[in-house]
Protein backbone atom coordinates (compact mmCIF):
# COMPACT_ATOMS: atom_id res chain seq x y z
CA UNK A 1 0.00 0.00 0.00
CA UNK A 2 2.83 2.37 0.77
CA UNK A 3 4.00 2.22 -2.85
CA UNK A 4 0.54 3.12 -4.14
CA UNK A 5 -0.13 5.96 -1.73
CA UNK A 6 1.14 9.52 -1.96
CA UNK A 7 0.49 10.32 1.70
CA UNK A 8 2.73 9.50 4.67
CA UNK A 9 -0.05 7.46 6.27
CA UNK A 10 -1.60 5.26 3.61
CA UNK A 11 -5.26 4.30 3.73
CA UNK A 12 -5.84 0.56 3.87
CA UNK A 13 -8.38 0.57 1.05
CA UNK A 14 -7.89 0.17 -2.69
CA UNK A 15 -10.67 0.80 -5.21
CA UNK A 16 -10.93 0.06 -8.90
CA UNK A 17 -13.36 2.10 -11.01
CA UNK A 18 -14.43 1.82 -14.60
CA UNK A 19 -13.78 5.05 -16.52
CA UNK A 20 -16.94 7.11 -16.76
CA UNK A 21 -19.13 8.16 -19.67
CA UNK A 22 -17.93 10.11 -22.67
CA UNK A 23 -19.35 13.58 -23.30
CA UNK A 24 -21.75 12.44 -26.02
CA UNK A 25 -23.50 10.04 -23.60
CA UNK A 26 -24.17 12.65 -20.92
CA UNK A 27 -27.81 13.65 -20.52
CA UNK A 28 -28.41 17.17 -19.20
CA UNK A 29 -32.14 17.63 -19.79
CA UNK A 30 -34.23 17.58 -16.57
CA UNK A 31 -31.19 17.56 -14.28
CA UNK A 32 -28.47 19.79 -12.97
CA UNK A 33 -24.94 19.77 -14.37
CA UNK A 34 -21.83 21.47 -12.99
CA UNK A 35 -19.25 23.02 -15.31
CA UNK A 36 -15.78 23.86 -13.96
CA UNK A 37 -13.77 26.60 -15.67
CA UNK A 38 -10.07 25.94 -14.97
CA UNK A 39 -10.50 24.89 -11.32
CA UNK A 40 -6.98 24.21 -9.97
CA UNK A 41 -7.16 23.12 -6.33
CA UNK A 42 -7.48 19.33 -5.92
CA UNK A 43 -9.22 19.68 -2.55
CA UNK A 44 -11.83 22.02 -4.03
CA UNK A 45 -12.44 19.66 -6.93
CA UNK A 46 -12.84 16.66 -4.65
CA UNK A 47 -15.25 18.59 -2.44
CA UNK A 48 -17.30 19.65 -5.47
CA UNK A 49 -17.53 16.03 -6.66
CA UNK A 50 -18.59 14.86 -3.20
CA UNK A 51 -21.15 17.67 -2.84
CA UNK A 52 -22.51 16.96 -6.33
CA UNK A 53 -22.98 13.32 -5.34
CA UNK A 54 -24.82 14.40 -2.14
CA UNK A 55 -27.27 16.53 -4.13
CA UNK A 56 -27.76 13.99 -6.92
CA UNK A 57 -25.84 15.89 -9.60
CA UNK A 58 -24.72 13.19 -12.01
CA UNK A 59 -22.39 15.12 -14.32
CA UNK A 60 -19.47 17.50 -14.00
CA UNK A 61 -18.04 18.93 -17.22
CA UNK A 62 -14.51 20.33 -16.87
CA UNK A 63 -12.42 22.65 -18.97
CA UNK A 64 -9.30 21.03 -20.33
CA UNK A 65 -7.21 23.05 -17.82
CA UNK A 66 -9.08 21.86 -14.73
CA UNK A 67 -7.05 19.79 -12.26
CA UNK A 68 -6.88 16.06 -13.10
CA UNK A 69 -9.74 14.10 -11.54
CA UNK A 70 -7.29 11.28 -10.78
CA UNK A 71 -5.00 13.52 -8.73
CA UNK A 72 -4.53 11.68 -5.42
CA UNK A 73 -5.89 14.61 -3.38
CA UNK A 74 -8.98 14.82 -5.61
CA UNK A 75 -9.61 11.09 -5.28
CA UNK A 76 -9.18 11.08 -1.51
CA UNK A 77 -11.36 14.12 -0.89
CA UNK A 78 -14.26 12.66 -2.93
CA UNK A 79 -14.65 9.88 -0.36
CA UNK A 80 -15.69 7.45 -3.16
CA UNK A 81 -18.10 9.88 -4.86
CA UNK A 82 -15.77 9.85 -7.88
CA UNK A 83 -17.25 6.44 -8.68
CA UNK A 84 -20.80 7.83 -8.79
CA UNK A 85 -20.40 11.16 -10.63
CA UNK A 86 -19.51 11.41 -14.33
CA UNK A 87 -16.53 13.73 -14.82
CA UNK A 88 -15.65 14.67 -18.40
CA UNK A 89 -13.07 17.10 -19.83
CA UNK A 90 -13.78 19.16 -22.96
CA UNK A 91 -13.66 22.61 -24.49
CA UNK A 92 -16.37 24.09 -22.26
CA UNK A 93 -16.92 27.17 -24.43
CA UNK A 94 -17.91 25.02 -27.40
CA UNK A 95 -19.93 22.63 -25.24
CA UNK A 96 -21.84 25.43 -23.48
CA UNK A 97 -22.46 27.16 -26.82
CA UNK A 98 -24.36 24.06 -27.95
CA UNK A 99 -26.66 23.98 -24.88
CA UNK A 100 -29.55 26.03 -26.21
CA UNK A 101 -32.47 24.69 -24.21
CA UNK A 102 -30.96 24.61 -20.72
CA UNK A 103 -30.42 27.62 -18.46
CA UNK A 104 -26.79 28.43 -17.71
CA UNK A 105 -26.04 30.00 -14.31
CA UNK A 106 -22.64 31.54 -13.54
CA UNK A 107 -21.50 31.53 -9.89
CA UNK A 108 -20.03 35.02 -9.42
CA UNK A 109 -19.30 37.46 -6.60
CA UNK A 110 -21.83 39.94 -7.93
CA UNK A 111 -25.00 38.37 -9.22
CA UNK A 112 -28.61 37.77 -8.34
CA UNK A 113 -28.97 36.23 -4.88
CA UNK A 114 -29.78 32.52 -5.14
CA UNK A 115 -32.70 32.93 -2.75
CA UNK A 116 -34.25 35.44 -5.21
CA UNK A 117 -34.36 33.19 -8.26
CA UNK A 118 -37.15 30.76 -9.06
CA UNK A 119 -36.11 27.27 -8.03
CA UNK A 120 -35.12 25.63 -11.32
CA UNK A 121 -35.58 21.92 -11.96
CA UNK A 122 -32.67 21.77 -14.40
CA UNK A 123 -29.71 23.85 -15.40
CA UNK A 124 -25.98 24.22 -15.74
CA UNK A 125 -23.97 25.85 -12.95
CA UNK A 126 -20.58 27.24 -14.01
CA UNK A 127 -17.92 27.60 -11.30
CA UNK A 128 -14.73 29.48 -12.11
CA UNK A 129 -11.06 29.36 -11.26
CA UNK A 130 -10.25 30.04 -7.60
CA UNK A 131 -8.32 33.26 -8.27
CA UNK A 132 -9.52 34.41 -11.71
CA UNK A 133 -13.18 33.39 -11.65
CA UNK A 134 -15.06 32.52 -14.82
CA UNK A 135 -13.54 33.59 -18.15
CA UNK A 136 -15.39 36.48 -19.84
CA UNK A 137 -16.12 34.34 -22.91
CA UNK A 138 -17.85 31.77 -20.68
CA UNK A 139 -19.68 34.44 -18.65
CA UNK A 140 -21.24 35.76 -21.85
CA UNK A 141 -22.92 32.39 -22.38
CA UNK A 142 -24.61 32.46 -18.97
CA UNK A 143 -28.22 33.53 -18.87
CA UNK A 144 -27.93 34.53 -15.23
CA UNK A 145 -25.14 35.43 -12.81
CA UNK A 146 -25.90 34.18 -9.31
CA UNK A 147 -24.31 34.54 -5.89
CA UNK A 148 -24.82 33.49 -2.28
CA UNK A 149 -25.80 36.47 -0.08
CA UNK A 150 -22.89 37.76 2.02
CA UNK A 151 -23.41 38.21 5.77
CA UNK A 152 -19.88 38.53 7.15
CA UNK A 153 -16.65 40.21 6.11
CA UNK A 154 -14.83 37.56 4.05
CA UNK A 155 -13.69 38.78 0.64
CA UNK A 156 -14.97 35.72 -1.21
CA UNK A 157 -16.14 32.14 -0.87
CA UNK A 158 -14.15 29.01 -1.61
CA UNK A 159 -14.93 27.69 -5.10
CA UNK A 160 -16.24 24.47 -3.55
CA UNK A 161 -19.01 26.41 -1.76
Each language-model region and where it sits:
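Short, acidic/turn-prone active-site loops that include or flank metal/cofactor-
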Residues: 1, 65-67, 92, 130-132, ...
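Short, hinge-like loop/turn segments at secondary-structure boundaries
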Residues: 11-13, 77-81, 122-125
Amino acid sequence: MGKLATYATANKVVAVFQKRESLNKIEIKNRFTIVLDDLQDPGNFGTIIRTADWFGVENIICSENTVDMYNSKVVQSTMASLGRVNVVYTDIFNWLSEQEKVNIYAATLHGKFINEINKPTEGILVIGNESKGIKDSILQLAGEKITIPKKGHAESLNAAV
